[in-house]
Regions:
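Contiguous, well-ordered beta-strand patches that form the walls/edges
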Residues: 25-32, 46-107
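N-terminal helix-cap/turn-to-beta initiation motif at the start of protein domains
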Residues: 4-21, 34-38, 118-120
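Structural motif
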Residues: 38-39, 96
Length: 120
């Protein structure tokens, strides 16, 4: 199922649902992104950053998401905030059912095994 032609949004959304985590590093800034995508189209992200070893206040974002298939496992992820304002549109690709790459910055997200979300 993973590598056939253009998938339907529902199939991609089913693969996206769950908790994902990515680590980032750019110069003196180290970050950790945790994203939870729910079946009802809602999402929540938490960004933690450390600048030169000093932790910055975490930033949490909530809203709704929509998926537009591009080709096979490649899709565009649209997010809006709780007030309906567009936030971002990023192109992502599923490498497999547990690995997703955000094409901006080539950030690799890995599915978190735990069924417990850190935001509950």
């Amino acid at each position: 199922m993973l590598f056939r032609g253009k998938q339907k949004p529902a199939s991609l959304a089913h693969t996206l649902v769950g908790e994902w985590q990515a680590d980032t590093l750019s110069g003196d800034v180290r970050g950790e992104i945790t994203a939870v995508f729910n079946t009802d189209g809602s999402y929540q992200t938490k960004n933690r950053m450390e600048i030169r070893g000093v932790a910055a206040a975490p930033v949490t974002q909530t809203g709704r998401y929509r998926i537009e298939p591009i080709y096979k496992q490649r899709f565009k992820l649209f997010t809006i905030d709780d007030n309906g304002q567009p936030l971002s549109a990023t192109v992502r690709t599923f490498v497999d059912s547990n690995t997703m790459i955000n094409e901006v910055g080539r950030i690799t997200f890995r599915r978190v095994d735990s069924g417990d979300h850190p935001f509950n």
